[in-house]
Amino acid sequence: ALSWYLKDPRDVYYVKSPKSFLGASGLHEIQISFFEDLVCAMMANIKQQAEKSTQATITDAMIGKPINFNGLGGEAANKQAERILINAAKRAGFKQVLFEFEPVAAGLEYESTLTKDQTVLVVDIGGGTTDCSLIQMGPSYRGKTDRASTL
């Protein structure tokens, strides 16, 4: 894809990390639709492969999300990105779509080893985002569905 793009950038869409664009400011509806189509195709493929592997219908999706999708757009960028992900997941066949902050998801395994509450620095380096978060973790936080207040 990169070599095609370099030959003629006017004729090819080249997106290295789609998630990093989901919260971009100034996107037109056609661009938002393009990203939704792209994410939907990826989710549908993953869903199909998982259903084939498990021989079961999968109706729920838990999606990791960075604390902020795009530093410049603030909460509007986060809402735009979440809307794209929800629409794509529903179109891919998921009935229930839930989100978890990526640094929380990254720290959950470690939290299961803690015997007392403490503040933990979780560094989550992904394909398009990096989150460094101080998170309250430990026995009294386990099982809480909303961890936003612990960040």
Identify the function of each model-found stretch.
Residues 1-12, 18, 56, 63, ...:
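Oxyanion-binding/catalytic loops of NTP- or PPi-dependent enzymes
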Residues 43-51, 108-111:
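Generic structural signal for well-ordered alpha-helical scaffold segments
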Residues 1, 5, 26-29, 33:
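A near-ubiquitous, low-amplitude feature marking generic local secondary-structure context
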Residues 28-48:
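Adenine-nucleotide phosphate-binding core of ATP-dependent small-molecule kinases
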Residues 47-61:
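Phosphate/pyrophosphate-binding loops at sites that engage ATP/ADP/AMP, CoA/4′-phosphopantetheine
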